[in-house]
Every structure is written in structure tokens, then in C-alpha cells.
Amino acid sequence: MEAIWLYQFRLIVIGDSTVGKSCLIRRFTEGRFAQVSDPTVGVDFFSRLVEIEPGKRIKLQIWDTAGQERFRSITRAYYRNSVGGLLLFDITNRRSFQNVHEWLEETKVHVQPYQIVFVLVGHKCDLDTQRQVTRHEAEKLAAAYGMKYIETSARDAINVEKAFTDLTRDIYELVKRGDITIQEGWEGVKSGFVPNVVHSSEEVVKSERRCLC
Amino acid sequence: MASDGARKQFWKRSNSKVPGSIQHVYGAQHPPFDPLLHGTLLKAAPKAPATPVKAKRISTFQEFESNTSDAWDAGEDDDGLLAMAAESLNTDVVMETAHRVLRNHSQRQERRKPQEAPGPEQEPQPSAEPPSVPSGDLRLVKSVSESHTSCPADSAGDTAPLQRSQSLPHSVAAAVGGTSDPSALSSSALSEREASRLDKFKQLLAGPNTDLEELRKLSWSGIPKPVRPMTWKLLSGYLPANVDRRPATLQRKQKEYFAFIEHYYDSRNDDVHQDTYRQIHIDIPRMSPEALILQPKVTEDNYTFAQPGIQMKVKMLEELVSRIDEQVHRHLDQHEVRYLQFAFRWMNNLLMREVPLHCTIRLWDTYQSEPDGFSHFHLYVCAAFLVRWRKEILEERDFQELLLFLQNLPTAHWGNEDISLLLAEAYRLKFAFADAPNHYKK
């Protein structure tokens, strides 16, 4: 039985190979961290509900993409139907930071005519002693592209919730303001279940108390 | 923050512990982990590329072989019925056997039901998840260590994670590996048949010239553990059929290998190879050490940019399934599940990510015995694999649940028995849905 949600957002997670995309998503969706993670082949799919305000749930469908170049033709098919994205680099890997620009270019070409709301994520912030990218320069880069910047660690569960939830809230605001609209043939945003469609009595009771704006 | 000068340079400092940072690796040799050999190679390589420690290599290779042979242990071979059929691998016999295996299996399933705790596969519910987690249910998840700082409104009952089932079944497989099917044919009969199969293999391998065609037929239904290393070497063409030529060939191939190392090893730090080396360096620790097995020949198309070969195979699978099981095909289509979303990995990794390692090994016994096993027959195996889950698939009525299921199929406890069934079904499909008869040489 589905829980009630206001909207469904499709998110995409991109960035260089081995910056920790899958581990970040697993931490977020499963609440755990694996020391060893198989490289993603093509695209993996995850899902989770987030509550952005009491009673307001958003269903997130998350595409976890392979960072390796040879999978690019597979992964780029997923930009178009994503409303939000986490662009990851590894703070201990300078090159992954330098590639942020290329990732943005790559998405820009393939997302049209739509847009993706990106947040820049400096991952593996638990490894501060091996840091190769300062917070300051990352913030500067993010600002230049109109993105927010956040540092996360899947291993120590730092800011993982926040990264996803903040992005979700931002998208929600844009949807509410009408800057992002639900469109036929576009999977980025879908509106949620109407309460009376749901047959679980518990769910119905819950939703009745709530204002669905 | 650090001073300007320091900041400009700080990331260039040696970062020996950064995952993926470029470090010197001395494991690029066969056998690995031999400190003696390391020492010798390290000292000898730059100056005297030609001749160090030949004899040593061979003996340590054998050591290595025996040290690592347990990687092949998980799960005993295999299904007696298929074994008998393989002795004369003609269509009728195999078809008949395939049917018998399927029939036999369903009977066993019946018998098994009452005395066995329901595993995920036997559960009536369409769940891809461990029994403790209700299926088909979207749940709010809190990362354990973060839960107090965020999502304050989560209700207590809503905290069970939406789990992906074992996406890496190897560890589980290792734990359950070797346990043979308790409901299999009586063990004495089984072991008798196994012993006679093993004898046949040994006879064939003993030469003087191994009949490769015969070896293939025998291997189709699984290769007994003790003879698997040699059998794979012969089936893959690594070693010759003639017994007397094998030692010399092995020596030559190993020499070639070390020559490659000497030729390319030092180039790993060249600028042009940095990206490749970095990727390799990252990928090696991610591979289970048990997974270091012979690679099949693959066409360039499969592993170059855009992987047109793989994409084409996914299309072929789609076409095949549309003919084999139109209902499943339509169901996926209706819910906008694309074959690329789940089957890309099946093709790219030859199902290695979808089943436990000992199952992959068993699968590859057959792939090496089938003409074009890794390419053509694999398609039918994938089709059989998909249709194997038809009940579960048809019960899911939502894109999300379908895709989560298909990307996390509940195979963690699969054994050789399951693979034998899958192969038998694939074999049946291959004949029933042949698209072009000339695919089936003899």
C-alpha cells in the first residue's frame, strides 16, 4: 500500500566515478554504509519518502548513475526526466572537482528543454585530513553556477538527510510558485495520490487532518 | 585556512590513503602476494627483464592455484539428470532431460514445502525483500545516526527502510555455499553418479588428446570441482588438447604474461594512462578476490564507449521476450519499465551481479560448452531468467516496485540447482524460439 505523498520528484545523482554516489544514496535510502561498494553499471534505481513539513511528504525516485565514461550513453538518457540533481565530487580528489564544470555542460545538452535544480555536494567530508578541495573554493564554484553547496559523508552520516531534504524543499517551493510545472510527457514532477483513492483507513485518517495545499 | 602558497599546493601532497589516489601497486603479477617474487621482480625488472625466477614462478603458480582453489568450492555439482543427458548431447535427449528436470523440480518443490521455512522465493507474496520487511511499501527511512537531527515528524512506525534486497549476494552465497540440496536424490545415488562423472572427466583430460567435443558435452551440465581448472583451460582454448604439449604451452603463456607486465607495468604512471590506471586501481579492491577468474572473449563493441554491442543485446532480449512471454513483455511496457533499466547489467556483467558467485561459475561451465555460449546462449538464459519471475512481475503494478524488484532479484540463496533449472529452460527456449536455425551448429 502506497503512503500518501503530495508530489513525486525524480532526482539524478551524477559525478565522477568513485566519488561516492551510490554510498550516499544507500545511506539515504537504507540508512547504512558499506565499506566496499560495487561500481554502478548503467543506472540503479532507489526510492524514499521525505517529509518536508509535518504531513507533507514527497516521494523521491532517485537515479543512481554510473560515473564511468563508457556508461555515459546510458546515463544521459535520464537527465531529461529529472527535476533535481545532486552533483557530487570527492573532496579528497581534486580532479573530480575540476570535472564539475564538464558534468554541468553534459547535463545542459541533454536536459533541454527542461532544467534540473542542482545542488553541489562535496562528498567524503569525514576524510578532512586528505582534503584537496577547500570549502571556500567549492562554495565559490557553486555560487557561480547558482547552486547550493553542501558537504556530506555517507560513512559518518553527515548532512546526508540535509542534502536530499534541502534540495527537495527547494524544488517544492519552485513547484508551489509555478516556476516548475507538471507537464504531460515529463516525469520530473508528478502530483501525488488523492487521499480518497487510498483505501487504507489509517492513511485516509492521516491525510484528512492535513491541508493539501 | 592555510596560507595562499600552501593552499595552492596542499592537494598535491602525497595522499597515500586516498581511495583512488595513484600509488605503486606491486600486485600486478601472477601469482600475487608472493613477497619473494615481489622482491625479485622489483629488483630485476628494470635491469634484467628476461629471466628471473622461472622455476619459482611455476611452483608458486601451482601453489597459488591450490591456495585459491576454494574459490571454486561453493556448491557441489550438480544435477544428476542433466549429467546423464550430457553424455550424449543431442537435441532430443537434452530436451527430454530439460523437461524431466523441470518436472522433477516442481515435484521436489511440492515435497519440500511443508518442512522448509519459507525463503523469499517460496513466499506467496511478490516480495523482493527479506521477510522481516513488508513488501511493496514505501517507508520513511531515517539514517540511524542522523535521525535525531532531521525529519522530526517521522512517525515511529514508519522507520523500516525500503530495502534493496541483497544486491551483492556473494557474501551470503559464501555463507550458504557448499550446502547441498537436502531434498536432492538420495545422496549415495548422487555421489555414485558424481563419481562416475568425475571419472569420465579424468579419462578425457588424461589424453593423450582430449576430445574437446566430448569434453564440451560432458561439461554442459556442470564440471566437477576437482577438474574444473583444467577443463576451463581447455574449453577456453588456453591450453591444447594434447596432454604432452600442455606444460610447455602453460609455461609459454605465463612467460608471455610476464613479458606484458614488464612491457606495460612501468607505463602505468605515464600521463596518457593516468585515467585508466586510476580506474583500475579503484576497481580492483572492489572486486571480490574470488572473482578473479578467466575472462571470456568479448567483442570490442561491448566495452567501448556507448557499448553498442551491449545495447544491441538488450534489444535482442526485448525482442525475444516479446515472443516468449507476451504478457510479461506487455506488463513491463505498460508500466514504462524499459529493458535497458534492468537488463543492461545482465548483459554487461553476464548475470554476475544477479546471482551468487558459485552460480556464475556453474553458469560458465555451460557457457563454455555451448557454441557462442557467452553471447548467443546468454540471451536465452537472460530470457529464462526474466520469465522465471513472471508471477512476481505480473503482481507488481507500479513502475517503482517493478524496477526495484528487477534490479534486486531475490537470488541470494540460489544454488546450482537453480542454475541447472535456468539452463534447462534456456535450452528449451533456444529450440522453441530459434530466430535463425543456423545458430545451432550440430
From Swiss-Prot, chain A:
Requisite cofactors: Mg(2+)
Phosphoserine carried by residues: S201
UniProt binding sites for Mg(2+): S22, T40, D64
Pfam families named among the record's database cross-references: Ras
Subcellular location: Cell membrane; Cytoplasmic vesicle membrane; Golgi apparatus; Cytoplasmic vesicle, Autophagosome membrane
InterPro entries to which the protein is assigned, alphabetical: P-loop_NTPase, Rab39, Rab_GTPases_membrane_traffic, Small_GTP-bd, Small_GTPase
Superkingdom to which the source organism belongs: Eukaryota
Region (Switch-I) location: 35-43
GO terms assigned for molecular function: G protein activity; GTP binding; GTPase activity; myosin V binding
Stretches for region Switch-II: 67-83
Catalytic activity, reaction form: GTP + H2O = GDP + phosphate + H(+)
Modified residues (Cysteine methyl ester): C213
A GO-annotated cellular component: Golgi apparatus
Positions of S-geranylgeranyl cysteine lipidation: C211, C213
Chief location: membrane
Regulation: Regulated by guanine nucleotide exchange factors (GEFs) including C9orf72-SMCR8 complex, which promote the exchange of bound GDP for free GTP. Regulated by GTPase activating proteins (GAPs) which increase the GTP hydrolysis activity. Inhibited by GDP dissociation inhibitors (GDIs).
EC number: 3.6.5.2
GO biological process assignments: autophagy; protein transport; Rab protein signal transduction; regulation of autophagy; synapse organization; vesicle-mediated transport
Residues given in the record as GTP binding sites: S17, G20, K21, S22, C23, S37, T40, G67, H123, K124, D126, A154, R155
The keyword Transcription appears for this protein: no
UniProtKB keywords: Autophagy, Cell membrane, Cytoplasmic vesicle, Golgi apparatus, GTP-binding, Hydrolase, Lipoprotein, Lysosome, Magnesium, Membrane, Metal-binding, Methylation, Nucleotide-binding, Phosphoprotein, Prenylation, Protein transport, Transport
Record comment regarding domains: Switch I, switch II and the interswitch regions are characteristic of Rab GTPases and mediate the interactions with Rab downstream effectors. The switch regions undergo conformational changes upon nucleotide binding which drive interaction with specific sets of effector proteins, with most effectors only binding to GTP-bound Rab.
Protein name: Ras-related protein Rab-39B
Source organism (scientific name): Bos taurus (Bovine)
